[in-house]
């Protein structure tokens, strides 16, 4: 079985910018590249799980999301780092348009994408972690017995006051990695 770190994307890996899809707007959070490289070196599967409601709302396409993920991989490769997989939900139950207006099991806080990744990568949840800047990023991890960390980047500073579960708090993705390695 494999150990993994499940990462939210916006506000955790990259600076939070509403409905980010343009490559020119992408910016890693401080220490994110180094953190991902350390996770790779320590044999963690690095798996991104992200809600992409901008697709559901018609702001951008799934192809734009895929293009941005390819760009992220290209940037990480320059530092001998990589993300093992990107999973994202393009749906929204209220604000979705057309086929994307859907109450699904993949949109966080539901755990459908976590369950799929756990199966796809044969993940040992007891040796795994989740990191995000919103409680809704971490609820599916907690539901699957994955140790969870709320980062103070993105929406983390606003979300911290609502913590009621056994989540830990850390400055950013890099500080999380230094705590577990």
Swiss-Prot record:
Record-linked InterPro entries: HAD-like_sf (IPR036412), HAD-SF_hydro_IIIA (IPR006549), HAD_sf (IPR023214), Heptose_bisP_phosphatase (IPR004446), Histidinol-phos (IPR006543), PNK3P (IPR013954)
Record protein name field: D-glycero-alpha-D-manno-heptose-1,7-bisphosphate 7-phosphatase
Stabilizes the phosphoryl group, annotated site positions: 50, 108
Entry's family note: Belongs to the GmhB family.
Cofactor dependency: Mg(2+); Zn(2+)
Enzyme class: hydrolase
Organism: Clostridium acetobutylicum (strain ATCC 824 / DSM 792 / JCM 1419 / IAM 19013 / LMG 5710 / NBRC 13948 / NRRL B-527 / VKM B-1787 / 2291 / W)
Active site: 8, 10
Gene coding for it: gmhB
């Amino acid at each position: 079985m494999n150990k993994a770190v499940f990462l939210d994307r916006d506000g955790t890996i990259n600076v939070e910018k509403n409905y980010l899809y343009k490559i020119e707007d992408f910016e890693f959070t401080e220490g994110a590249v180094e953190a991902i490289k350390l996770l790779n070196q320590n044999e963690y599967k690095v798996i991104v799980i992200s809600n992409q409601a901008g697709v559901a709302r018609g702001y951008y396409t799934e192809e734009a999301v895929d293009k941005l993920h390819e760009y992220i991989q290209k940037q990480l490769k320059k530092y001998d780092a990589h993300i093992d997989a990107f999973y994202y939900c393009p749906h929204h139950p209220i604000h979705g348009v057309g086929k994307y207006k859907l109450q699904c099991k993949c949109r966080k806080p539901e755990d459908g994408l976590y369950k799929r990744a756990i199966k796809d990568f044969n993940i040992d949840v007891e040796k795994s972690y989740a990191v995000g800047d919103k409680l809704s990023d971490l609820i599916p991890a907690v539901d699957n017995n994955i140790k969870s960390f709320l980062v103070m980047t993105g929406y983390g500073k606003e979300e911290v006051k609502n913590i009621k579960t056994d989540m830990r708090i850390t400055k950013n993705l890099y500080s999380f990695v230094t705590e577990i390695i």
